[in-house]
């Protein structure tokens, strides 16, 4: 790069020039110093926290961080309409088209991916990684990793990892979903733990369930206080409550029965509506 005339830069030998905006200085051996804003392919890059107010803000992208006011500090946003509505929010990070688009005053959110946390207004301390993750969230202290993860949630303190995990959660809080479409249909239930692909997939309002293993408690809708560990354990349970199944296919056919305990592979596998049973051992009962 060869500075010419103090107003242009000559690039290579083609003779193409680039205008130097106000606030740009060139010093021998000191490189290029930028103290204002500049434009890259139509998008404005705001530097030094000087656009238009606030401290230590960095933004790149059309309308990114355009609403920032005094008191809105330490925000980093990259992408078209990313963080557009942030006014006094502090310490937010948004990367992706429409990421954190509606956020105004909340702080310490991380949104990475197209439309991640896009309608969040006041929820704080959320982490959303993946397109549409936590898209409609208004709650706080949620962690969502994966495309569409916790897309609708308004509750708080949820953790969801995996595409479409906790996707339909609206008001449910303190849920943990790890795996593809784990707890996908959950709406308002609290305190569920689902680990494994499609575990607790159909659960809507059943609370205090623990499902560990692929498709464990997959059909459960309103059943509560169940513990199911093992692939396909309690596979058919829909409304049964307070059951314990430990082992692959344990209590697999249970639908509405309560208060059963099955320990061992295929234990109580054929039970559907019987209650207060205890079976220990492979294929017991």
Q: Regions from the language model: what does each represent?
A:
Residues 17-25:
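Short, surface-exposed terminal/edge motifs of secreted or surface/virion proteins that either
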């Amino acid at each position: 790069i060869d500075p010419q005339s103090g107003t242009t830069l000559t690039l290579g030998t083609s003779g193409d020039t680039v205008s130097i905006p106000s606030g740009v200085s060139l010093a021998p051996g000191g490189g290029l110093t930028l103290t204002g804003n500049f434009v890259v392919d139509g998008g404005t890059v705001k530097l030094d926290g000087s656009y238009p107010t606030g401290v230590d803000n960095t933004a790149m992208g059309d309308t990114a961080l355009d609403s920032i006011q005094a008191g809105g500090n330490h925000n980093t946003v990259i992408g078209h309409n990313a963080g557009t509505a942030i006014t006094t929010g502090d310490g937010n990070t948004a990367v992706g088209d429409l990421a954190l688009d509606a956020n105004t005053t909340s702080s310490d959110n991380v949104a990475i991916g197209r439309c991640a946390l896009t309608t969040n207004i006041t929820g704080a301390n959320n982490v959303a990684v993946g397109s549409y993750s936590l898209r409609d969230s208004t709650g706080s202290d949620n962690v969502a990793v994966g495309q569409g993860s916790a897309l609708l949630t308004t509750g708080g303190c949820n953790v969801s990892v995996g595409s479409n995990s906790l996707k339909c959660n609206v008001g449910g809080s303190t849920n943990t979903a790890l795996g593809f479409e784990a707890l996908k249909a959950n709406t308002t239930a609290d305190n569920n733990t689902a680990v494994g692909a499609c575990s607790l997939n159909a659960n809507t309002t059943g609370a205090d369930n623990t499902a560990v293993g692929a498709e464990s408690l997959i059909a459960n809708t309103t059943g509560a206080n169940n513990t199911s560990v093992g692939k396909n354990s309690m596979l058919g349970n829909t409304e049964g409550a307070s059951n314990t199944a430990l082992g692959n296919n344990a209590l697999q056919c249970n639908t509405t029965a309560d208060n059963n305990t099955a320990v061992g592979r295929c234990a109580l596998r054929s039970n559907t509506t019987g209650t207060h049973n205890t079976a220990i051992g492979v294929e017991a009962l």
